[in-house]
Amino acid sequence: MLEGYRGKALELLSSLGAEIGDVLQVYNDKVSVKGILMPSYSRDDSVIVLKLDNGYNAGFSVNKVKVSLLEKGNRPQERSEHRELLPGKVKIISTGGTIVSKVEYETGAVRPALSTEEIIRFVPEIQEITSISAEILFSILSENMKPEFWVKIAEAVKRAFDEGSEGVVVAHGTDTMSYTAAALAFSIQRLPGPVVLVGSQRSSDRPSSDSGINLVSSVLLAKEAPFGEVVVNMHGESSDTYTLAHRGVKVRKMHTSRRDAFQSINDHPLAKVLWKERTVKVLRNDYLRRSDGVELNPKFENRVFLLKFYPGLRPDIVDILLSSGYRGIIVEGTGLGHTSSDFQEAFKRAVKEGLFVGMTSQCLFGRVNMNVYQTGRLLQQSGVVPLGDMLPEVALVKLMWALGQTSDLEEVKRIMLTNLVGEYNPRHSLDHFPRWKHE
């Protein structure tokens, strides 16, 4: 069976007696390459796809190369299309990214799998875990994510649970996944099952791709985990042994390209997923239990600014934000939660005009304490609210959500200081901080 091939490519491969898994050679005056014949997902009927010795897949147009059959390969085992699935249902909601995408090799473009059948074909192991359904909500780069898209994702998650899903997997690009995780955590509470955000650091055509393992472990997590909260599930180390489920309001992408880039900050992961053993190992008992009756409040005010203080930053930036109609500022201050003393009057004016101003730390690890030094105490007198160990991005999203619920400044302050879904960790331990080796 020559899956996906048609037209000129199908005609040529059929004439050679080639099948998926056979070793072919393509050549012309400039190049000679051999590789294993792979299924095609190309729209160009002249393209054949080979997996090269380096592990990468490449497409070749039969209009530009000659093709010969070098040896017959091992036939891939066919999986039944009509097998009895295990009880339980997991909904996969795709928003973009490479996690459930296929590569069109003639252009290099990546397109999402567009149906449940395509996702199962992409990662057939998920059939062994549970029955799934899939929805392509939209397909965007994660840097193009906006609060209005968070609303659509939240509504889709609520709809999935209303339709009987036991857990939901949200496929998402990795760059802004932690923002979306926080947005879902605040806007959908009392969850009846896990909401698992998952992405891929390496595209599916690369030999080191993490997409298959991440998706398999996320489906397993969505079905088996006892908690009812939003988590991010990604590789737990650089090898392929396990993934870690991080609480959605305590996680951050800490490396540009490593497969284990996502780390819990000031917190421990909730669970470890041993995907080969099909086992979910719960690491803590303080998780939010599954609940009945989802509470959906997906309203966000995006006139909120994340202000990173640096030496020389002028306080008139606060007045610019005030005159531009912003309703809140999250400050990413230095150390225990500081800016220069120049900002005291500017923040006082902002608070007087009804803006919420909250303080987080650039250090990420540890918590804000604005009572230690005079600068912090004076900033508090100006109306700046210390936000403990909340991550700057999480504080930003929470303030967007809080302002979407109420315009009363005191109520916003109450919401921001209330530990709703584990965004504050009241107890820190030594092993919350990564100690780098220098030997």
Swiss-Prot record:
Enzymatic reactions: L-glutamyl-tRNA(Gln) + L-glutamine + ATP + H2O = L-glutaminyl-tRNA(Gln) + L-glutamate + ADP + phosphate + H(+)
The keyword ATP-binding belongs to this UniProt entry's keyword annotation: yes
Domain Asparaginase/glutaminase: 88-419
Active-site residue numbers: 98, 174-175, 253
A single MF term (Gene Ontology): glutaminyl-tRNA synthase (glutamine-hydrolyzing) activity
SUPFAM superfamilies listed in its UniProt record: GatD N-terminal domain-like, Glutaminase/Asparaginase
UniProt superkingdom: Archaea
Entry EC no(s): 6.3.5.-
Alphabetized Gene3D superfamilies for the sequence: 2.30.30.520, 3.40.50.40, L-asparaginase, N-terminal domain
Swiss-Prot/TrEMBL keywords: ATP-binding, Ligase, Nucleotide-binding, Protein biosynthesis
GO biological process: amino acid metabolic process; regulation of translational fidelity; translation
UniProt keyword RNA-binding present: no
UniProt-listed Pfam families: Asparaginase (PF00710), Asparaginase_C (PF17763), GatD_N (PF18195)
Subunit structure, interactors included: Heterodimer of GatD and GatE.
Function as written in the Swiss-Prot or TrEMBL entry: Allows the formation of correctly charged Gln-tRNA(Gln) through the transamidation of misacylated Glu-tRNA(Gln) in organisms which lack glutaminyl-tRNA synthetase. The reaction takes place in the presence of glutamine and ATP through an activated gamma-phospho-Glu-tRNA(Gln). The GatDE system is specific for glutamate and does not act on aspartate.
Family: Belongs to the asparaginase 1 family. GatD subfamily.
Name under which the protein is recorded: Glutamyl-tRNA(Gln) amidotransferase subunit D
Gene source species: Metallosphaera sedula (strain ATCC 51363 / DSM 5348 / JCM 9185 / NBRC 15509 / TH2)
